[in-house]
Every structure is written in structure tokens, then in C-alpha cells.
Amino acid sequence: MSRRKARPARPSGSARTARPGGSASSARPRTAAAPAVTADSPCPCGLPAAYGACCGRFHAGPGTAPTAELLMRSRYSAFVVGDEPYLLRTWAPETRPADVDFDPALRWTGLEIEETGDGTAFHQRGTVTFRARFTHDGSPGELHERSRFTRHEGAWVYVDGDFLD
């Protein structure tokens, strides 16, 4: 991760801070005060499945997302639920930060996948272009990014991304 911008900690994860327009702060808790999501709740990633059967299975277990898009979705859900260990585990070693700084005033409210490039079981690299909606202190916002993914030791990991707006 060669570039870091003061933007929301992105669902794909390429910024360390979780504050729109803010900076990382070590005084913040390392876990977000996330909304209650249970195994039976609708999955935050937007697929028509319960969290436990969708992204929650990747968060809880040793299984890995089989495509770059599913990794993107599971990382978005990890931001929603404040799952720092999963985010760090699915981050490419060469760009992984020491920690993820969640902003308790930030709430992720929706994910739209616009486009995927490669990123299947037959590829070593892939891209996912998405829009992630959020509120910060009640004000709405949106993050538009093209994220890059690669395989590391056989599993998909997030590398970095480019802001599109």
C-alpha cells in the first residue's frame, strides 16, 4: 500500500483511517462500535443470504473467498461488523498496515459492485470496481473505488485501490 489518503477506511481496505477527511489516530479503539449483525441477519454485502451463510462464514472460519468479488464483499462486511483480524488476514503482506483504525461515527450503509475484471478461480489477479455508501455523524457519503486483488499462498488478498471520484 504505497499511498494512503485521509478517506474512510475503505471496505476493500486501502486507507488506514475510518474517518472521511480525517487522519489515523492511535487514541481510537481498534474495534468499531458496529451495528448488531447476527448469523441470521441479512448479509451487509448485499447478496440475498444470511450473514452466517455468506460473508460470516469467511470471517469465522479457515475458509477463503473463492473469487476477488466475494473477497471484496466479505471485506466490506468486515468493515460493517468491525472485524479487524479478518481485514488484516485478507490484506496483501506488502501493503498491510499494522492495524485498522475504525471511526465510531462512521456507518457503512450499502455496497454496489459495478464491475469485476478477472479474479476467478482461473486467475492470479483481479479487480473489483464498487461504490460503498456510508454515513458519518449522520451525513451521507459514498466511496467509489477500483480495488486490486491477487493471490497470496493460494488465497485472494486485497492489494490496493484507486479512488474514482
What is the role of each PLM region?
Residues M1-A32:
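Short Lys/Arg-rich cationic patches that frequently serve as NLS/NoLS or arginine-rich RNA/DNA-binding motifs
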Residues S2-R7, G46, G138-P140, E153:
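Intrinsically disordered, low-complexity acidic regions enriched in Pro/Ser/Thr
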Residues A36-A49:
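Short Cys/His-rich zinc-binding micro-motifs
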Residues A49-Y51, A60-G61:
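Secreted/processed peptides and extracellular or luminal domains of membrane proteins
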Residues A53-C55:
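Cysteine-centered loop/knuckle micro-motif
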Residues A60-D99, P104:
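Core segments of small alpha/beta cavity-forming domains
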Residues P104-E142:
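Surface-exposed, charged secondary-structure patches
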Residues H144-D165:
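Short beta-strand edge/turn micro-motifs at domain boundaries
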